[in-house]
A protein has these predicted regions:
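N-terminal accessory regions of nucleic-acid-interacting proteins
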Residues: 1-32, 36
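Active-site-proximal helix-loop-helix substrate-binding element of RNase H-like nuclease domains
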Residues: 4-5, 52, 57-72, 76-166, ...
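Helix N-cap/beta->alpha junction signal
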Residues: 15, 88-89, 247, 336
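Non-catalytic, usually N-terminal nucleic-acid engagement modules in DNA/RNA processing proteins
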Residues: 33, 42, 50-53
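Flexible glycine-rich surface loops and low-complexity tracts that mediate binding to linear polymers
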Residues: 36, 87-88, 354
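Short beta-turn/strand-loop junction motif enriched in small, turn-promoting residues
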Residues: 37-39, 113, 270
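Accessory DNA-binding and partner-docking regions appended to nucleic-acid-acting proteins
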Residues: 152, 172-381
């Protein structure tokens, strides 16, 4: 479904005056639906390129690249009086916090709600299709949102992602209430508000982060590390994502095949003529010289937890899995992974200790705490 760019209902915000008007109207709203578009597939340092907000039948497409200072938007995002509706909010929040320092309070995530209700298809498109028969055109999902001017079709796409979020929230919220899961959902929404910003340095460049790296010989790992560092530096200089310089699979193929000339290098899968023309000699030299390196970065080895911790973790996981099957929801809806790991590691000995560990999850503590403590103490399997 394409949303027409009717100037009566769709407002392009690209200067201080239109931003001021937008914020004044949003201050009067009880809830706003929010989405963002970024350019992570096209640059080294990604950035938020659009912020879309729908409220009270109006949609605002805010252009951070042209508008300038967006700090007053924080009054909307941090207001406990205005509900912010997102779908799959985690990435949006991390990027908005990184780029603008926004804070968030009073949030509803339709993807989290759908998971908690046991929906099997939780993408926004399938949810709208299944719940309301609304079809979203997703062809611009991976578009370069950093280009200007944006086409009319891209703007229509941007508006469509927030246009129906309030309607979806109403339906999912009613179901959560009916199933008595509102309190658990609210816990997850509040935890989401406290998520950390995305890192300002976005990429790791270590050989063990590359799929297949741990299976290589030490010499091959050295060569792979050299290629990782070269790729990272070149990506920064050219302002491109590292994979557009050289893919992970191409780097592994290079170190495994150990080519001695550009002709052999060119024939490797994932390399090709364009890479060889630009980087051929450099790649061959790195592949050769880094094999002889005596020291390269190494991963920090994790100490094996004590047997008691491992046993407690497995008991908790088994209980969580069975409870998820019983309630027809993913297991981490029952108990988030990070909290499970903390409980397994600490091993609470009484209600008070467990309540402290689950301080951000009071609803789950009251619902499942007694059983969790039994399992932690190994009083019941």
């Amino acid at each position: 479904m394409n949303i027409e760019l009717d100037p009566k209902t769709v407002h392009i915000v690209n200067d201080t005056d239109s931003l001021k008007d937008c914020i004044e109207k949003l201050r009067c709203s009880k809830e706003v639906a929010v989405d963002t578009e970024s350019d992570s597939l096209f640059v080294y340092y990604e950035k938020v390129c659009l912020i879309q907000i729908s409220a009270d039948g109006q949609s605002y497409v805010i252009d951070p690249l042209e508008t300038g200072d967006l700090s007053e938007l924080n009054d909307i995002f941090s207001s406990p009086e205005i509900l912010k509706i997102f779908h799959a909010a985690e990435y949006d929040l991390m990027c908005l916090k990184r780029d603008f320092g926004f804070e968030f309070e009073n949030l509803f995530d339709t993807m989290i709600a759908a998971r908690m209700l046991g929906r099997k298809e939780i993408g926004l498109g399938p949810l709208l299709e299944n719940e309301f028969g609304i079809h979203l055109d997703k062809r611009y999902q991976k578009a370069n949102w950093g280009v200007r001017p944006l086409s009319r079709e891209m703007l229509q796409y941007a508006v469509s992602d927030t246009r129906f979020l309030s309607q979806l929230k109403e339906k999912l919220s009613a179901e959560l209430k009916e199933r008595g899961m509102e309190d658990m959902a609210q816990e997850d929404f509040e935890r989401l508000c406290r998520i950390h910003p995305a890192p300002s340095e976005p990429h790791d460049c270590f050989w063990w982060k590359v799929n297949g790296g741990v299976d290589l010989t030490p010499a091959e790992q050295g060569a792979l590390q050299g290629l990782c560092e070269f790729r990272e530096g070149e990506a920064k200089v050219r302002d491109l994502p590292p994979f557009k310089i050289l893919s992970n699979s191409a780097m592994v193929n290079i170190v495994l095949e150990n080519p001695s000339n550009e002709g052999t290098l060119r024939r490797l899968k994932g390399v090709g003529s364009a890479v060889v023309r630009r980087y051929g000699r450099t790649i061959l030299e790195i592949n050769k010289s880094w094999r002889r390196k005596k020291r390269i970065p190494q991963p920090v080895l994790q100490t094996r937890p004590a047997n008691g911790i491992l046993s407690r973790r497995e008991r908790l996981k088994t209980w969580r899995k069975n409870m998820g099957l019983e309630m027809d929801v993913p297991s981490d809806v029952i108990l988030p992974r990070d909290v499970l790991e903390t409980i397994a590691e600490v091993g609470p000995r009484n209600d008070a200790e467990l309540e402290i560990l689950m301080k951000d999850l009071p609803a789950r503590y009251h619902r499942f705490g007694k059983k969790i403590l039994e399992i932690s103490l190994n009083e019941s399997e």
